[in-house]
Amino acid sequence: FPTVQILITGIGRDNARRLTIETLNESDAKAVLTCGFAGGLNPALPRGTVLFAGDDNFPHIEYLKKAGAKPGSFHCTDRVLITKEEKEAAHEAVGADAVEMESGTIQQLCDEASVPCATVRVISDAADETLPLDFNQLLSTDNTISHAALAKALINSPERIPDLIRFRSKITECAERLSAVLTDALIQNIQSSP
């Protein structure tokens, strides 16, 4: 059976770079999946859509397709795109289907190490949706969510709490959708192994 190692890099390129370098140096990775949430840029793709983009030599693309992931393109940025206007402008500028913050760095490191890599992301907020808070304002210097900044934002704007609770519910559904696709793809891989 294939060995699967899960690495949680956190938010942003710096965290992704540091932990991916460590992991690639300490393991004999045969392939890498960079997974997580993405903001929608393509207005035709609803929240909950699982997209993938991979190297031509990535060995598990067919499993992802059979599991329900759709081919797509990603734009990697240094910040969370909050408003539908920001997402529309990014879509017009780069034409990508979704936006996220880590896969470009992980892909580059895998290319340098000659390790096949694919990005698999679920759209957590569609192109026409504005996020309930500016999550960029909540990030600490190490790109983790600052609980103090979150508390301050909610104290200053308590009317956003219901929207944030609804967003949490939507995010949970998206995480479950991504998990189902990845689990199905892994099971297919195991079943096809000699």
Predicted features and spans:
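Glycine-rich phosphate- or other oxyanion-binding loops that anchor nucleotides, phosphorylated ligands
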Residues: F1-P194
